[in-house]
Amino acid sequence: MYRLFFLLILCPFLYSQDLGKILWGEKPLTSPLNFDYILAESKNKNNVNLSGSFYINSYPKGVGYEVIRDQKTFKNRNNENLFLKFPEFKLDLSIQDQKVVIHNKKIIETDDAFWDLSFSDGMAWSKEDHVYVSAPFTLIQKHANCSHNGVLLFALNSLNEISQSIFQISSETCAYFQFNYVGIFDSFFDTKDINKEIISKKYDKKTIEDLYERYPSILRGSFADSDAFNIGEVTAYGFFDGEDHFIGPCLTRSGNYPFCDDLLLPAYSLTKTISGSLGIAAYQKNMDRLLIWG
């Protein structure tokens, strides 16, 4: 049986609690995770390599949610029904030192009435003879242009036994339906050999501040860091100059998102952004020509 517990925004984030005891069921989860805590913990090295299949009992042992925005125009369901059960899935993953490689990164079309799922590559670290695994996941509304981004977290002991897992959502790309969510689940990990996926080299990642320093002619506040944007409604922003990828902070309601490189965005929203950016660039280029010719 599952039980519901409701988390208030005034609850302190889990930053100093013993995460290990919570995952292994020795202490209750009483508040959401602070994602900055995951970033800090992930600095611990890991030299354990293994692979297997990860899945959960889809009915949570405990779940809390807070609906922040729900426009009635789009409402065709009871919100409570959305969180009674997590969509079923099975992940094949490999822990390769600090990296966690998800081998089935495609969108998972589930039998759930409301949600599809997607997972991407994450990170691993060791602490007190346990390997901690964290990876990004996204709940995708069926037949809609909305994605709700979260973080998965669990641990494995020296016998490859798995702890409970935590799923938490604190951001989204969705104008009409927004919520905070955290659930804790009984979990399973079946070790098995998986052909190792070669981790492709990514472009060097730098901050937006690095961009302004490299290109002094670009005024600060030229991107989504401008006052013209409501930073609370910006999922991600950045700039690629052909060599380096300059990324702005992926802010959430629970600190900085630990997996800004692997953030799933709705196709329609992303297409609008890319098309608009290219259109403005082309317009500016033509205007410069007109000014020169004039």
Name each region found by the language model:
Residues F13-L14, L19, L23, I38, ...:
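Extended hydrophobic/Leu-rich segments
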